[in-house]
């Protein structure tokens, strides 16, 4: 967990619909708070609150899968989550010069490694399999194409905005 800069957080709502949300930060951005406790800071992103809504209104069950660049095996963690806005806890988790908006406390109930076969087959970490950025239109161009609203930003403008909004 301390080596992972990226994970996927899965939650479910009260009807059983599942949401999976990518989460990232510096390696170890999810803090190990104790033998059965993880602390995940909530950073600004797309400003959707699906995961937290599911935790508060649904079962509270969460599952994570942690990735470490270059390592094919992943770590899977399951447990029960709750959301806190404890100012002292949030102040201890400043990253990119900003405290989190909230913290997800996860009471861990299961942890296990997942074999690396899927990542090996996908060649996810191989430079040879990486796709050139120019192959895909920017997210702004895709949204413009679907809605015809506004003016589409270039990929460079999108990336510049990402950097200022981390």
Predicted feature descriptions by range:
Residues 1-166:
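Binding-site signature for planar aromatic cofactors or substrates
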